Amino acid sequence: MTTPRSFGPLGDVALLRGHAPYTLAGYAGFRAVIDTDGAVPARLKALFIAVAAIDRRYPELARRELARGASLGLTVRDATAGLIVLSSLRGEGAALEFADVIATVFDDSGAPPPQDLPHAGPGEAEANFLAYFGTIPVPLAQLMRLCPGAADAYYLMRRGSIDANPLSPKHGELLLLAILAAGYSPMAATHVRGARMAGATDQEIAEAVLCAVPAAGIAAWIGVGAMLAPD
């Protein structure tokens, strides 16, 4: 029996081929959405899958998907968007793991010269929070009260993830959503709103969330899907 490419490595598991036709058919259906151009380009969806895989600590899945993205035209600069978002959202360990994956996939992953580091001016963090959230969320209000320097640091990192991302702000938001969906995080609601503010359609949001399925299963959709229900 020929194994359709859309199964991915799951199709190589003899026990699944012999006992789980519904599972493989369903997975192939998800792959048909996330492996091809749709509302979101396939090369970016491969990046989203790779970064979600790092979130779930599956570096081999991440390497395979990043290589697939590169074959579709994904660049090192594009991949750096994942490195930036992981640094902010999941910390040093996840970011370094993804940096290793980037180095194995791209023959030339040379970086440009270092840039000067920005600083947050007085009131800059608060203004950014108000512009994005509409109000100061309680956790950030307490961070500003108890450790203002850390509040500035939070602002700089979230600005790097969205406004200064090598991708567009819209695709930066969608990348964040893929990670949050993979982690079944309630924070996804904030970035559904942020993605819409950045111009994303619900179809784009849906495809980004589905990019979490290879690493986190169909439960990744359940946590976010209800947020897309029409008002």
Residue ranges with predicted function:
Residues M1-L44, R56, E60, A67-S71, ...:
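Acidic, glycine/proline-rich low-complexity segments that act as flexible tails and inter-domain linkers
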Residues K45-E60, H171-P186:
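Amphipathic, charged-and-aliphatic alpha-helical interface segments
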Residues V51, G82-L86, V101, L177-A178, ...:
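Short acidic/histidine-centered micro-motifs embedded in hydrophobic/aromatic stretches
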Residues I54-R57, V85-E92, A181-A182, C211-I218:
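A short structural micro-motif
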Residues E65-F98:
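Hydrophobic/aromatic-rich structural module bridging two neighboring secondary-structure elements via a short loop
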Residues P114-P118, A206, L210-A216:
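Alpha-helical transmembrane segments and their immediate juxtamembrane flanks
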Residues M197, Q203-E204:
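C-terminal structured interaction module
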